[in-house]
Each structure stands twice: as structure tokens, then as C-alpha cells.
């Protein structure tokens, strides 16, 4: 037999190509193999670590997770010899990985919405995007937010103020203080030498008591008030009279009139106090007026007492008449019932015999009792059904209220959703990264417990004209046009839902005022002259043309990232204004005339 012919290249071409393994978009094979087993005894299977977590955590990171991943740029950020030595001797390995482009774009969009984009570096954005990628591969993106929750505005007339420390309910041992207060109110120690507060009367005594030297006596008439008709009738009372007893003499409003008022001796009736005639006449007029008021008050009290007695007697007579009428009605109803019973018994005796009558009566009573029991059971069942219906309706109301209240837009719900039980976490101490991670719904671990307590939304506020803009990437104020006056402030949602805009201290102008260099002309002048207003920038720089997509109305027309990260592949870069130099001048106390690269004159 002839040997088999050798395989020609045409036969190889005709064969079907070998099947390629399925590739998941946005997820490399390393990610799929790493997140294959999500079960972990430590609670976290994969942890995305930052440079500050590696430096601060050191060997304690071993107890946090089973595997550690990061981006390659994080390892290059650790430059000092001590940190490099610690990184070389850590008891675990840190794998490097790149996030997917889709997750990176979502993180950038989310950070721009929260106002943290300018505070995050490229490495920080990649770390958050890597956490987003791993979380999406394990649990999906349903539990993650694409847009931060909207800020709810609630108009509050007056914010509730907390009690000072140690006052009111703001004490550490409130229960002990309440128990002590209740104990002192219930029983008082008679043997104690310390008087309670209710017995401290500041030396003010009643008219029936006599105090020592220097005491003040206040004479007031105590009358009984009518409880039922209180406030309906206005009573006239004599004015209060204040007397001071000084060494046996009674002084009335600064006048020593004790002898003329309280001297009961007949021999001394001709004596008068050593005062002027006008003072004595004033005293007599006051005394007459006081006696007149007392007489009127006594007459009104007598009239009121007589009226009260008449009313009480009238009410007693009415109640007695009602009771007698009720007793008569009860007696008549009893007699009527007895007559009806006698007539029914007579009719039964005439129709049937005594035995049959007794049997029918017994059966009738049993049926009546049975019917009554059935009706009672039916009433109980109906009442129980109504109670169950009310309880169900209350439960539905509470469920609806709770579901409406927790709609995911409050600060409390942000914190609860952020503390998820995911097996993928990000370990970082950067506050801007923590703000974005918590609002997205990712799990966060802070090295050393350095974690933010409140979630913030950042805006820019001009300290020259107090204009607020949500465009966090702006350099110049959109209203007054000043550069460097936009300051980053936080818009916090408090516990009651009110928006609270943070305030920063005023800027110290010392060291910021200096002469500006003269503008220069020529082709390269655009790269040398300072930029102090937004209209100094060329139109093509403010509104760059893009061939990929048309600009939308909601897009930002000026972003500093586009200015700083605008790289060209041409041999000679076009001339552009020094926006970076303007930023350095606006953000720091730097003199633009100072040239750090000049040769020393010494």
C-alpha cells in the first residue's frame, strides 16, 4: 500500500480554527481567578490597598484580608528607604492589577459629581476603579450607585440646640441623677442639717409669723378660689403692704409709724411720731385706703360664700329628686315584670300540664343559653377580627412610612449602605477617596481607624462676591471673574436634613500683594504674560473642538484637567497661556517675578 499522503497546506486551511476560551469583557483572567472563591474566614477575601495603608498598616494588614491587590503606581510611590524596607519584609504578597476602562470612567464621573475630582490623583482614581471592578465581578453593579444621592433642602426655622455638657439630659450618668432626684422628692431626712431648696424662703414670712431683726413681712390676704367658676368673676384685692421690723419698731415703706399704729396705751394717745405733717397725712390716707379695700374684699367674700351655699343646696335638691325618681321608676319596672311573668305562667298552665310545661321550660332555657353562647362567641370573633384588621392596617402604615423615609437619599442611609458585608474592600486613609467610596456603596477599611464621620458634597465659593458654583474645576469666578477667589467648601446634610454650607476663615493678605510685571509683546508673549481674568484665555482654549462627539448643554465648558493634561503629538507644541503658572500664583503665596532657576549673584 502506498503511504498516506502528507498533509498539504490547503487541508490545514480548510480545517476549523481552534475554539478560543470565552473572555469576559472588562475582566481579565487574573481577576476571574482571584474572585472565584469569595468565602473568607477573615470577612474580606480581596483588599485593594493604598500607599498610606501599606506604610501605616505594616504587618497588621495580614488580619484584614486573604489577598491584597493594588495598581503598579502605588508601589512606585513608596520611595523612602524605611518604607521600602518595610514593604520588602511584609509577610504577604501584593499583586498588581489594572482596572477596566468602564469602571474608571464611572469613577471619574462620580468623583466629579461629588466635587472630589480635583482632590484625587490618577492613582487614587485607579484604586477606586479597581475596587469597583472587583465588586462588579463578584456581586454585580446593582448595589452600587452611579450618581450620588440628591441633596434635599428642608427649611428649618430654628435648628434644635443640644444641651451643654453636664446640663439637662447631656450627662454621662443620667439615670443616677434621676434616681437621686426622685429619692429626694419622695422622702426627706428629718435629721439632716441641710435645708432643702423648697424651705429656703429668703427670710420672707407670712403675716401670722414674727421674724427676727432685718426680716421682711409681706401681708397678703389668702382667699379661697372657686375651682368651677375660676376666672369668670374678677375680684378686687387690697394692694400688698410691705413692713420691715427693725429692733421693735414697725417701719411702713420707710416711715417710723409704729407708735401711731400699734400703740394701745391710752396715756400715749396724744403722742405722734417724729415726722412731718405731710408724711403723717400720707400715712393716714394710706391707712384709710387700706381699710376701705379690706372692707370691700370682705363684702365680696361674703357674697361669694352665700352664692356658693345657695348653689350647693340647689344641686343637692336636684340630685335627691333624681334619685327618688329613679327609685320610683325601678319599683314600677319590677312590678310590671312580675305581672308579665304571672300572666305567662297562667297561660302555660292552661294549655299543657305541669310536667310538660316544666320540660318545655327546661328545653327552652337550654336553647336560650346555647343561643346566647353562640352569639357571644360570634361577637368575640368579630371583635378579634376587627383588632387584627386594625393591627394589620397599623403595620401597613408603619411599613409605608419606613419605606418612604428610607429612600436612600438621607445621610443615615448613606452610612448604612456603605457598611455592606461585601468581601471586596478598599483600605485607604485618604479622606477624598473615603468620601467617594462610601457614597458609591463600596466597602471601606481605614488603617488606624482614620475614617471620615460625615459624607460631604464639595462646591466652590467665591470669597469676593460670595457666589457658589458646583463646577469644581473652575479657576475663575463665573460672576466677578476674579482668579484664585474660589475656595472649596463642603455642603453637609445634617441629621435633620438641612443643608449646612461650611465657612472658612478669611484670607490673610500679608505676603500676597506685590507688583505685577509689565506685559510683553511678540509671538511668545502668550506664554509669558500673567493670566488674571478668564477673558484673557483664547476662545479655542475655552471651547476646544472635539471630533468624537458634540458638546452637550450640561457639559462643563471649562475644566482645568483638560488644560493641564492636554498633550500634543506634534514635533513642536503650540503656544499656550501659562495656566499652570496662574494656578500656582492663585493657590500659593508666590511672587511671579521670582525666578528660582536664575544663577546666584554671589
UniProtKB/Swiss-Prot annotation:
Gene3D superfamilies found in the cross-reference section: 5'-nuclease (3.40.50.1010), Nin one binding (NOB1), Zn-ribbon-like (6.20.210.10)
CDD domains: PIN_Nob1-like
Summary of the knockout phenotype: Delayed pollen development with reduced nuclei content leading to reduced pollen germination capacity, and pale seeds with arrested embryo development at the globular stage in homozygous plants. In heterozygous plants, strong accumulation of the 23S-like precursor P-A3, and moderate increased levels of 35S/33S precursors and 20S pre-rRNAs. Alterated leaf morphology and inhibited inflorescence elongation leading to a loss of reproduction, seeds abortion and slightly reduced siliques size.
Keyword field: Coiled coil, Cytoplasm, Endonuclease, Hydrolase, Metal-binding, Nuclease, Nucleus, Ribosome biogenesis, rRNA processing, Zinc, Zinc-finger
GO molecular function: RNA endonuclease activity; zinc ion binding
Domain of life of the organism encoding this protein: Eukaryota
E.C. code: 3.1.-.-
GO cellular component: cytoplasm; nucleoplasm
Positions of region (Disordered): 1-25, 258-278, 301-331
Free-text tissue specificity from the UniProt record: Highly expressed in flowers and siliques and at lower levels in roots, hypocotyls, stems, leaves and seeds.
Compositionally biased intervals (Basic and acidic residues): 301-329
Principal location class: nucleus
Coiled coil location: 331-365
Domain annotation PINc: ranges: 48-134
InterPro entries referenced in this protein's UniProt entry, alphabetically: NOB1, Nob1_euk, NOB1_Zf-like_sf, NOB1_Zn-bd, Ribonuclease_PIN
Keyword Zinc: yes
Compartments, record wording: Nucleus; Nucleus, Nucleoplasm; Cytoplasm
SUPFAM superfamilies per UniProt: NOB1 zinc finger-like (SSF144206)
Zinc finger (NOB1): 452-522
Residues given in the record as Zn(2+) binding sites: 462, 465, 477, 480
GO biological process: embryo sac development; pollen development; ribosomal small subunit biogenesis; rRNA processing
Free-text function comment from the UniProt entry: Essential protein required during embryogenesis and pollen development. Endonuclease cleaving pre-rRNA at the 3' end of the mature 18S rRNA (D-site); cleaves 20S pre-rRNA in the cytoplasm. Required for processing of 20S pre-rRNA precursor and biogenesis of 40S ribosomal subunits.
Family, per entry: Belongs to the NOB1 family.
Subunit structure, as described in the record: Component of the small ribosomal subunit, ribosomal RNA processing complex (SSU RRP complex).
Protein name: RNA-binding NOB1-like protein
